[in-house]
Amino acid sequence: AETAPAAPADSVPASVEKPPAKKRGKKPVGLTGTSRKAPSASVSKLITEALSVSQERAGMSLAALKKALAAAGYDVEKNNSRIKLGLKSLVGKGILVQTRGTGASGSFKLSKKAAPEPRKGKVKKPAAAKTKKLVLSRDSKSPKSAKANKRAKKSRTTAAQKAARSGRKTKEAKVKQQRKSPAKARAAKPKAGNPKLTQQKTNPRKATNRK
């Protein structure tokens, strides 16, 4: 009778130790839930990439989208519901525009706001063009200044040439005057010599008379 109460004392701690084992088993369930949420982001990326590649103006249908995703290596049959949820979320965010149909069925295309990358490239090109225009405007201004400098130099050279020509003309005029003045002096000298000759001619007669 004394050994009987010892057995239930051993069974009580065993029952107390079991609940923490059950709590540990609940943690992996939360991890699996987080792992299921991750593929939705990849699905939305694949959908946006497929629509950016498509050249259809009216948009891409759901069947064509599934084909593009399957070609990219995505399992469409297992993740059909995720594709539809991804399409709805993208339409709600404004990244996609539904051109036809309702809900997940129909055709979709990227909105203008969802493609900023090509616009950035287009914006960068005009910026480079503006810099080129500024450089060209600076270069265009420099030839004008060079032309103005050339004109100023030409005006200076022409003024110097005119001054040199006027100096030459004055020198030539002086030389001509100097040439003319000795000729006049020469012409005047013989006139002064004629009376002497007459005196010499008259002098012999006077000598004969004296004789």
From Swiss-Prot:
Q: Compositional bias (Basic residues) at which positions? A: 121-135, 147-156, 176-189
Question: Where are the annotated segments for Disordered?
Answer: 1-42, 101-211
Q: Where is this site: Important for nucleosome binding properties?
A: 55
Residues recorded with modification N-acetylalanine: 1
Q: Which residues carry this modification: Phosphoserine?
A: 142, 166, 181
Q: Where in the cell is it found?
A: Nucleus; Chromosome
Give every H15 domain span: 39-112
Entry PTM:
Phosphorylated in early spermatids. Citrullination at Arg-57 (H1R54ci) by PADI4 takes place within the DNA-binding site of H1 and results in its displacement from chromatin and global chromatin decondensation, thereby promoting pluripotency and stem cell maintenance.
For biological process, the GO terms are: cell differentiation; chromosome condensation; negative regulation of DNA recombination; nucleosome assembly; spermatogenesis
Q: In which tissues is it expressed?
A: Testis-specific.
Alphabetical list of Pfam families matching this protein: Linker_histone
Q: Give the similarity note.
A: Belongs to the histone H1/H5 family.
The record's function comment reads: Testis-specific histone H1 that forms less compacted chromatin compared to other H1 histone subtypes. Formation of more relaxed chromatin may be required to promote chromatin architecture required for proper chromosome regulation during meiosis, such as homologous recombination. Histones H1 act as linkers that bind to nucleosomes and compact polynucleosomes into a higher-order chromatin configuration.
Q: What is this protein called?
A: Histone H1t
Originating species = Sus scrofa
